[in-house]
């Protein structure tokens, strides 16, 4: 089997040598995709879809890589990287280069395989899309999820319709019926509806499953003509519905191994006009079985339990099957290789001549049903309303040709003529012809009973003797040999039976029933008298071969006799292997085309012909090993020459030595049950069986006794071992105790020595520590001394800097003080001038007020005198006038007091302003004085001695003079204010004094 790893390649060949699917279980190629870019090194394929031609398909893995595989051109190409897993694919659109892919984000995209560009992006689903169904025209598509199904127009990529359902009822699948305009919708409650695509009118509804059936439909498949619907689920039953009659017409029960059906698909056939008869059923064990829905026979199967299938897709023309395996790889199967043994020849066109009279019908009730223009397979005639007609037979030659007429309507003589003309049967129809020639009954029940008995004890260790690489092939061989051994006891002791059956097992490994019946038919007919001298080789058969060889080639036989080569050397190896060791596959098939088409003696004649055709190399052989090697290995011999020689021997051999006179004619296996095979020395076989049984029983008894003795011996040994272990343990404990004591003493001595060394080391460390501390102390003192010296230098530098700054500040301060003194003297003169002016103004106002009061008093006196004179005129008027005058006087006095108060307030404000300015100058002078006061004593003395004498005297006497001056000034201002206030009060309190 070829395997192709896509790796990181974007294109390449699918296979690098011509596939041979017939020798590899029908597998053309196995495709895997491994990469190092992602964490999982093997990328699993998830979905596959074929195009309309059936020669190309697309496949997508779980990382979103989509490849196109062209089986006709042997090429693959990476067409898209979607970066997310695809959940469904469709590749049969109207534009052949476009395909649909449903992604994990619930969207559907359309890509082009040629340009590798995005054509359209469709959204609308709210859950994962599980299937895409495309209309036969390629213009419409239905995408199905668990909650909805949507109909899309692929010309505009717009959604046309949407199928919504209740949440309690989920959608199982919605798809188009092939070659029709009908949509089939299947729901999780087993309801199935058919809708018109254009109007969405409900055409019909299928009734529910029959009572007693608890199957829930999960998977569906429809034939190409759209007439039959197959449904399955978690059961081994399949329901077949007739969509035209809208009824269930058949229930197929799969084998008991099948517990659930995961996928269904019909196998298309070019000759059935769309009414597919073969249904592929993928079950939970990963095996896909193909059954005939009419005969309910298992035809073949793909996949194994070890290498199970996850999903499969069949090409539209039925040539290929693409299966995604459970390990994530992709297998491509050839349907022709899988069905080569069951293929039937195309039915010829026939012409109905006339009806056969009823009185000429033989005991067989078989009749050939004639459909319009075709010949059907034979069927038993029952009471039926359908009229049947049969071909007219040659009544005169009926008895002669009776044995040449096969059940399938083939004529043995015509086949022999065809075989002689072409040398072999057509590869496509060989298996069908063999089954017809051997007249296999296909007893399913009988074969199942043999298989159900399990593997025979004689073949349990078959793999050790015959190590076959293919597990499936070994399993089929073991099952076939076990069935033969259960059928007849002789085959459990036949050593060459695996060699005899292996070619047929390899040829019919997909159909074990046919394989068993072919081998059984071969043994009954072509292995006649082989077991009469069991367990020795068939001496009588070998004698026949030797007699024929003596008649046709005495020289060669004499050469064998001279070299002590018996028939067990030159004949028996060919018979027990049926020429499989000396011929290739094609040569072997060609030979058995002739063997099955002739009398059983043809096989014995073939042995003679093989030797006579090889007489030249055989005459040159002298050693027995050379002869043995010759008859066990392939030789440069033309099989066509051998076959022609066989026919020549069959015709020219005398009747007295001809094997056909000693061998019976062909006898087919009986229908229903297999015949009893007892053509062997029963007493020998029974004796051997009894001996084997006795030996087996003795061996079992011996094994049981040996097991008992071994158990007892094991118990004794175990007890002895326990005792010995206990003594050894005690001895070890004693020795360990002594050793521990010695170790303890040694450790104590070592401890004392270590303590002494530790004390010495401790003393040394203390001394070192003292020295180190002393050195550290000295180092610290030196460091502190250096730091103090550095600080002193820093302080000296700081003092010098501050002295310089102080000198500069003092000089600047002296200048500022001189300037300030001048300013203050100017302000003092200004203030004195203002004060004099204000005093003069106040005195002037007082004088004016005094003069006014005097004039007013004189006027009042004058008026008083006048009033006295006019007192006779009325006392009330005088009294009112007096009150008015007093009010006027009070008003004038208040006005003057207010003016005097305002003048005093203004003067006091000016005094306070000048005092504030003087107060602002005092802190600055005091700060300068304090800075000089905080200098060090030595420095202050030094500075005073260095200062100018005039500056020193000024700085010492200036504060005292200023304080005296300020005090005198404030005192004068306060006295003046006091006098003015007293005068104002006196003038306000005693106005009558002024009047007097």
UniProtKB/Swiss-Prot annotation:
Residues 388-414, 699-844 form a coiled coil. One of its GO terms (cellular component) is ciliary basal body. WD repeats lie at residues 33-74, 75-116, 117-157, 158-200, 201-248, 249-296, 297-334. Pfam families: RabGAP-TBC, WD40. GO terms for molecular function: molecular adaptor activity. The keyword Cytoplasm applies. Keywords: Cell projection, Cilium biogenesis/degradation, Coiled coil, Cytoplasm, Cytoskeleton, Repeat, WD repeat. GO terms for biological process: cilium assembly. Residues 424-599 form the Rab-GAP TBC domain. It is found in: Cytoplasm, Cytoskeleton, Microtubule organizing center, Centrosome; Cytoplasm, Cytoskeleton, Microtubule organizing center, Centrosome, Centriolar satellite; Cytoplasm, Cytoskeleton, Cilium basal body. Residues 983-986 are annotated as: Mediates direct interaction with PJA2. Its main location: cytoplasm. Interacts with PJA2; the interaction is direct and recruits PJA2 to centrosomes. Interacts with OFD1; regulates its activity in cilium assembly. Interacts with PRKACA. PANTHER family: TBC1 DOMAIN FAMILY MEMBER 31, WD REPEAT CONTAINING PROTEIN 3 WDR3. Molecular adapter which is involved in cilium biogenesis. Part of a functional complex including OFD1 a centriolar protein involved in cilium assembly. Could regulate the cAMP-dependent phosphorylation of OFD1, and its subsequent ubiquitination by PJA2 which ultimately leads to its proteasomal degradation. This is TBC1 domain family member 31. The gene is Tbc1d31.
